[in-house]
């Protein structure tokens, strides 16, 4: 009788408006209940029945109510759903198709409509992409609904980790096919003929997209002329063409374990633009004068267009063995041997120059997966960069320094790799930390390139692994930008890469700018949109690489008796919930829950900001410590490795 009475409705609205409301993010638990996390210190309990209305990660507003003398959050309004586009496994029940999202906190099926072509033999466990169409917290909806938009792969296919990961981050999994007859070379530019010179390439034995070649001439007074020749794909790719737009979309060649997705069509990257032995190829070259102390003499260095012909395709391991007096391999002729000797000399003097006047980064091992022909992980092995790798790297760094200088002086813009060191707030934290170790710096000093280089040289000279780790936590991230700026991590005034145009679109952009300087032609200034696309792509590639490696590590350890052996691992991070370590043997990241560090919770403190674990106020573990770890569990659904100290 009073159901629709206006006074009663008004009273209900008033009472409802007086109930306190909070906004936060839903956090699920394995037991079914959850919490509404307001900030790092405040959260409210969400009972099991209320969790049925929301999903882990949803941003919502909730009413705060009292239930059995306990304050609880009752979900009221959805602000932003956690699930929008997602990956999951298909569930088939007669004619009904559902999907379970691939996430540790999602275990329930979501009924789906289908807007893509499914194979006739689709089975439960097959992988697909879906979008959330309906949410329970939106008024009028009583269930979650999704729509399948792309079928990925069968559940038992050997490529599941690769294709699922690529689909998750909306990355291509195929090579772009291009008819060779449609590739037209721009032959209008004048090029110097250097095909008679003894250019050599050094790369991995499996590399097909070879984009750099080197040649050295010795000068008087211990100086050298180094010519760095880089493949010129922009001579085949007009600016703004469909192929150019295709390259921009991909932005990078994606190197995943056992699975490479090129930026450019293979007809270009592995054939016409690859600096193959005894094949005449167009290049952009940089002639670099280096004095006996390793200093680049910019007044005698310049860029030009050329034709070259590689006289030898060499392999990193063979060259390293020969220069390190190991193995049986020898250069095929004295000219090639002489080139290697001179390149090694340049490496030594340039490295010494950068040690004294810039910054050398510390050597870190690389971990590589050994895969079988059907993509099973056979082993994970560690490799350190050897002499040949460092020779090529030093030559590329010198060439990129020259590019940054020329672009800055001639145009004032390009695509630069910039790293600003510390921002204002973090510089204060760094100064306080350094003072505890007896190093006196002021915050303004370490924010200058000179001061930052001084700090890095001190840390490189002394063995302060913990201090080094903490300071790196305060460093800013490197970024790409259009205008020149310092690269603190390299200790350089400016740095612009151009030496991998087959693999990086940003290098193609700098190629076009350098060519406009060389040929005195119209400069096409890159748009801001290009940087946004490249940075977004780089971010997704890094996340995909991390996720795939986690998946492959979990597959690798699942295939062996992982509980029998212990191994050395370095503590790389401390969280409130435990610590993360990295195996020194194979590079696997392993999480150790706090309960395995000490079983009395109120005696344990995991101090995330300090990177230290205290037990009864005594320091027991800190980042950079090497500890013995035993693997005890593999959480296959989340691809996480769980361990404990030995």
UniProtKB/Swiss-Prot annotation:
Location relative to the cell: Cytoplasm
Keywords: Cytoplasm, Exonuclease, Hydrolase, Nuclease, RNA-binding
Domain of life: Bacteria
S1 motif domain: residues covered: 564-646
Principal subcellular localisation of the protein: cytoplasm
Domain RNB: 191-519
InterPro entries linked to this entry: CSD, NA-bd_OB-fold, RNase_B_OB_dom, RNase_II, RNase_II/R, RNase_II/R_CS, RNase_II/RNase_R, RNR_Ribonuclease
Reaction catalyzed: Exonucleolytic cleavage in the 3'- to 5'-direction to yield nucleoside 5'-phosphates
Gene Ontology terms describing biological process: mRNA catabolic process
GO cellular component: cytosol
Enzyme class: hydrolase
A single MF term (Gene Ontology): exoribonuclease II activity
SUPFAM superfamilies on file: Nucleic acid-binding proteins (SSF50249)
E.C. numbers: 3.1.13.1
Gene3D superfamilies in the record: 2.40.50.640, Nucleic acid-binding proteins
Similarity-based family: Belongs to the RNR ribonuclease family. RNase II subfamily.
Function (record text): Involved in mRNA degradation. Hydrolyzes single-stranded polyribonucleotides processively in the 3' to 5' direction.
Stated name of the protein: Exoribonuclease 2
Organism listed in the record: Buchnera aphidicola subsp. Baizongia pistaciae (strain Bp)
